Design a protein with these regions (language model features):
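N-terminal beta1-alpha1-beta2 module of alpha/beta enzyme domains
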Residues: 1-78
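Hydrophobic residues within beta-strands of alpha/beta enzymes
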Residues: 56, 83, 112-114
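Flexible, glycine-rich active-site loops centered on histidine and acidic residues
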Residues: 2-34, 93-130
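Conserved catalytic cysteine-centered active-site region
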Residues: 78-84
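Active-site nucleophile and cofactor-binding loops and adjacent substrate-binding regions
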Residues: 60-63, 85-93
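Short, well-ordered alpha-helical packing segments
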Residues: 45, 72-75, 88, 98-105
């Protein structure tokens, strides 16, 4: 049995603490050291790849950048790193989700992994109509 390790892309900005996970914290808030710029996220992704991580988890939610768009852009600055894209199936149609996933897989040479989530914060779920 081999172990595979994944990293995390801080698409709401990065800081010294992991408490709170970034949920509901605006980019640039107190404690956030680096905003979630494409340049910084590219740096994180390339570092994870160089260190041998298999994939990078990319969160979804109103509090962070769009996981699909960010990871699609990051495929251009990485070679092997896979992207574990979190998405909520109730927010977009199944047909569109399938098309997005197929396009991503084709253009990234098979580097998409999906993390189907239901959400976990009641205020955000209400805002999305759950």
């Amino acid at each position: 049995m081999s172990l595979r390790f994944h990293w995390f892309l801080p698409t709401n900005g990065d800081g010294r603490d992991i408490v709170g996970g970034g949920h509901g914290v605006a980019t640039g808030a107190a404690g956030t050291i680096r905003p979630a710029s494409l340049a910084y996220l590219g740096q994180v992704a390339r570092s994870a790849e160089q260190l041998g991580f298999e994939a990078a988890l990319t969160p979804t939610g109103a509090w962070c950048e769009d996981a699909w768009l960010v990871t699609a852009m990051l495929t251009e600055v990485t070679e092997r790193l896979k992207f574990l894209v979190a998405f909520r199936p109730g927010l977009i149609s199944p047909t569109l989700s399938a098309q997005m996933a197929a396009t991503f897989q084709r253009h990234s040479r098979g580097r998409l992994l999906l993390n189907v989530v239901t959400g976990g914060e009641s205020a955000e779920q209400r805002a999305y109509g759950d």
